[in-house]
């Protein structure tokens, strides 16, 4: 199933239609849909697709390339010789980091190939990579031999929540939020899910060959040689420990420096560091959050229960009992995306320029949307609950109180509540949204 990606596909097709040499880099976490995107762009074009492995790539590549260009059989086993036979062709090399692992000099070889053999041709060279750390350091960095040779870079991100409806047109929005808490916007996981969601999850966990048991190890091996400490940190964050001190206490690492580990997790986009929206990104009030719902789900529910799952005694009810609490955080992400869409359509009281969390001395506001130029602020409370009128009034009063603590005294203030279901949306004090508004 191919969902969304219109902008990426348009950009790729423009490159493929050009009369110039094009060198395009596509990267993003595993399972995100890089290969599908690349192959979709060339489905009606003659091309060479090669998935790099951990050894003997020269031999394997030659075999695949010969199906499109038989004369390559006469080339010696050498990348430079190969590309001499492949001028003006479309060549896709998937998992390019495997070529780098096999031979680090391949970067300089490809630099030479581009500079000497390809730059004045119509060749289209597309390389894909799932190791974000290696693609960043070895391919995209200004220190890379390939720096300055690329004509296009596409970073593939998870699909947005709204696109889940295309995977599950019969699902209600509440069930889509439940699925999103498990699969995020990762196409590979979304394609695995069947409705009803809880029946699927129960069966999947009980499968002896379930992908849930090995998937995160599979993801982490691409980024870390020794993942043990990284796993512990991710588990700590998944259970609500967001400050450096909280993470250290959870792990019992009071005297250890976790900063390098956190920095590495940020680099590969497993986690992100957030600061209150009114503060600098360098603020000491930083908190750490898992970026990917699938990874958060794994470390909250699968990783701590692997033994019980292996023994076949884990009960899905343990997840169900906690899931609404977990979805509180997930729904904040959904609400943020929803408000950004409304903002694009000019359906809010003003056009905001940034949006994020705020916290200070034990007080928190789920989202604040700001336009500092016009001095306008929208304060938002997000509740994964069914809200009656009295609940709305109580939440609004508390949100109004907290808004006075933020320090935006000269700003024009607006208020909003986003809930699972709101009894009545007639409230003159604030904007009210629930899942019905997502349609």
UniProtKB/Swiss-Prot annotation:
- One Gene Ontology molecular-function label: ATP binding
- Which keywords fit this entry according to its UniProt record? ATP-binding, Nucleotide-binding, Plasmid
Record keyword Hydrolase present: no
Alphabetized InterPro entries for the sequence: ATPase_dom (IPR011579), DUF234 (IPR004256), P-loop_NTPase (IPR027417), Restrct_endonuc-II-like (IPR011335), WH-like_DNA-bd_sf (IPR036388), WH_DNA-bd_sf (IPR036390)
Residues binding ATP, per UniProt = 28-35
Q: Which PANTHER family did the record assign?
A: ATPASE (PTHR34704:SF1)
Query: What is the protein named?
Result: Uncharacterized protein MJECL04
């Amino acid at each position: 199933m191919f969902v969304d990606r219109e902008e990426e596909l348009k950009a790729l097709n423009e490159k493929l239609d050009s009369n110039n040499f094009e060198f395009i880099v596509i990267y993003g976490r595993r399972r995100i849909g890089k290969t599908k995107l690349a192959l979709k762009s060339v489905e009606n074009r003659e091309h060479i697709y090669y998935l790099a492995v951990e050894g003997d790539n020269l031999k394997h590549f030659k075999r695949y390339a010969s199906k499109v260009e038989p004369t390559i059989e006469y080339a010696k086993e050498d990348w430079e010789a190969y590309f001499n036979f492949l001028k003006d062709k479309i060549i896709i090399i998937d998992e390019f980091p495997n070529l780098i692992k096999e031979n680090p000099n391949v970067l300089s070889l490809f630099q030479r190939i581009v500079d000497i053999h390809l730059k004045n041709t119509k060749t289209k060279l597309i390389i894909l990579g799932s190791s974000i750390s290696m693609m960043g350091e070895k391919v995209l960095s200004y220190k890379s031999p390939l720096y300055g040779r690329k004509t296009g870079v596409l970073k593939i991100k998870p699909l947005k929540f709204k696109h889940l409806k295309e995977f599950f047109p019969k699902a209600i929005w509440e069930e889509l939020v439940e699925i999103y808490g498990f699969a995020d916007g990762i196409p590979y996981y979304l394609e695995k899910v069947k409705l009803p969601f809880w029946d699927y999850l129960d069966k999947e966990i009980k499968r002896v060959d379930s992908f849930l048991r090995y998937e995160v190890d599979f993801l982490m091996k691409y980024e870390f040689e020794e993942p043990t400490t990284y796993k512990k940190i991710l588990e700590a964050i998944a259970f609500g420990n967001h400050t450096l001190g909280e993470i250290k206490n959870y792990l019992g690492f009071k005297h250890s420096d976790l900063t390098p580990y956190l920095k590495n997790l940020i680099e590969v986009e497993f986690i992100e560091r957030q600061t209150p929206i009114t503060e600098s990104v360098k603020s000491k009030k930083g908190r750490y959050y898992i970026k990917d719902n699938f990874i958060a789900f794994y470390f909250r529910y699968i990783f701590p229960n692997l033994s019980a799952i292996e023994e076949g005694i884990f009960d899905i009810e343990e997840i169900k009992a906690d899931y609404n609490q977990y979805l509180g955080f997930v729904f904040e992400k959904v609400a943020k995306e929803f408000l950004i869409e409304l903002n694009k359509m000019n359906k809010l009281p003003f056009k905001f320029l940034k949006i994020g969390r705020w916290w200070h001395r034990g007080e928190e506001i789920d989202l604040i949307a700001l336009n500092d130029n016009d001095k306008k602020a929208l304060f938002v409370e997000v509740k994964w609950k069914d809200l009656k009128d009295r609940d709305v009034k109580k939440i609004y009063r508390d949100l109004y109180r907290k808004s006075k603590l933020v320090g935006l005294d000269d700003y024009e203030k607006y208020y909003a509540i986003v809930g699972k279901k709101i009894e009545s949306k007639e409230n003159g004090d604030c904007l009210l949204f629930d899942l019905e508004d997502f349609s």
